[in-house]
Amino acid sequence: VEPLKMDDLTKYTFLSGPALSPDGETCAFAAHQMDLAENEYRSDIWCYRLSDRKLTQMTTSHKDGRFIWLSDGRRLLFSSLREKEDIKAKESGEVFTQFYTISLDGGEAQKAFRVPFPVSSITEINPDLFLLEIVWWPPFETLAGAAAAEKPKLLQSMKEETDYEVLDEIPFWSNGEGFTNKKRTRLYLYDVKTKDLSPITGETFLAETPQLDETHERFAFTGIDFSDKLEIRNDVYLYTLKDKSLEKFSMGETFLTDYVDFWDKDTLFVVGQEQRNYGINENPKFYAFCLKDKTLRCLTPELDLAPGNALNSDCRYGGGSKPIQKDGEAFYFLATEGVGASFKKICPDGTVETVAQMKGSLDSFSIKKGKLAFIGFHELKLAELYTFSNQKFEAVTDFNGWVLRERTLSNLERLVVKADEKHPTLATDIDGWLIRPVPFDPDKTYPGILMIHGGPKTTYGENFIHEMQWLANEGYAVFFCNPRGSEGRGNAFADVRGKYGTIDFDDLMAFTDEVLERYSFLDPARIGVTGGSYGGFMTNWIIGHTDRFRAAVSQRSIANWVSKFCTTDIGYFFVPDQNSATPWSDVDKLWEHSPLKYADRVKTPTLFIHSEQDYRCWLPEGIQMFTALKYHGVDSRLCLFRGENHELSRSGKPKHRLRRLKEIKEWFDRYLK
């Protein structure tokens, strides 16, 4: 058994997208690994057969991570770049998605069809007709309709146009996507035989979550038409294939529908929120929308939990499965509850039941004919594929078992900080954990690092996080908690609108006090603090309000709510929602809650880590804070990652992820050891 090493990150296998075949007998999923030499990720499709436990690698091109089952139940349809001509065409700037099929019976993948747009999702209506969600942009349309002889000239013209960006709407860029002005997700029908591509939605319409009914004669989806400013609301639409009719249904003036499906032929299943009581982060409710009388009925008025998994980890890669899935009469979903993710179902009468819970994290799932498959992190194990029957989980893969067998890991010690006389600033108990250094000697004292999650509406749980375990193996105690603002404990607990840097700061400081009191091996003169996104905001805030931390690492942070409002992809709606103010309604309030205001008080040596293409918390946020600290004579450093975005720590290029970890450790070593 050896210590966990920084570059063990490059040896893990990340699993995603489990999907059971139509008969529920075979589960396909994607497996991803880092390729350090090429500085990229390799993705392949695997299948696990439930009846005889046979595990088969279906593809080996390392470029195949997204797929669907075809209705015959014997073949998978997936997008890939395999042939030299296709790779060359992509490199020249051509825009298309090439689909292949591969059979469970073996043999090579077969070319299926090509679509002249980037395809973000595909659904089979029948063997000759597919519903596509495509990324549409006017130049893509021009290219798609051009004759082969015209394409070189058009591609050259498009290449020249990359020197300019013309913007006339907000948002005009999006983290991970770059400039998005006039780009839309549109729905199309694709006829395999005629190669006809027919648009369902218009050029300025943003469509999402298309879902077929059981007869495959209709599909529902959500969307909004916009040309100047994207509003954070949408409507529900119903398309009937036979007569090509499109109906629009409004769920309410401020209603945001997250997901739509069919309870039955006359009733839509709607998941969404009115955003009236808790703003854009309000937990959604489940509804039934009657197509006959156009009425919306809330099935879960008392429910206060969010579908989806909000647990933090740096060991995920690849897309998830559909977040909500129907099987029989019920819909199934994951929900973040307390410090874990549980698997639940909702019945037509609105009854919500817990089906399964795992200590660790349930990441994604598939359910077909009562059969269940999950990607999960059980306790300190990394992701594996699990089946679930007779109230028991069973790991059916062992991609990452070597980590537990061959590396030293440290258990998570849970501590609950009580809201009592000792902690007068706490309004409620706070969940937290500490990971001891490895190896641990009770007669020694150790440096510690407080880690703060992003969101703020995400959460820490009891699952594997490489960065934490590695720092523990480097001699640090790592401690972390879920302050007010976090997910998993309902709307009221998560509501920090207009209070950033107040109650959340109090919770983090009370937690730090408790950790130092409870663990005498921690040296209070050698503790550091770090966090990313909202955690970066809190790091910036903390160093302006206390000198108790010897060093700080602020990552993809927020420094100034005014600049955040006017420059980032979500700023124009996120900032007023979270701060109850705009630069024009109350600029003083925004400045009051901006860490930059307090930069003249900072004495803590701070490393800033930022990505050049982070449009969620744009580069000027890190630069402003770094410049302010340098101006005031504080030891500081800015490490900028080219070609990376807000997801650097989770899906950045392998070499960049290692460099980020190296920068963090070396900064803390310098001041805490």
What are these regions (language model features)?
Residues 1-14, 47-65, 90-95, 100-119, ...:
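Multi-bladed beta-propeller domains
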Residues 7-43:
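Beta-strand-rich domains and repeat architectures in extracellular enzymes and scaffolds
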Residues 12-27, 61-77, 85, 116-131, ...:
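Conserved beta-propeller blade repeats
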Residues 37-42, 85-96, 178-184, 228-234, ...:
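Short, solvent-exposed loop/turn segments at conserved positions within beta-propeller repeat blades
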Residues 43, 86-96, 135-188, 284-289, ...:
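Predominantly five- to eight-bladed beta-propeller fold
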Residues 399, 403-525, 532, 566:
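Cap/lid segment of the alpha/beta-hydrolase catalytic domain
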Residues 483-673:
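Active-site-proximal cap/loop segments of hydrolase catalytic domains
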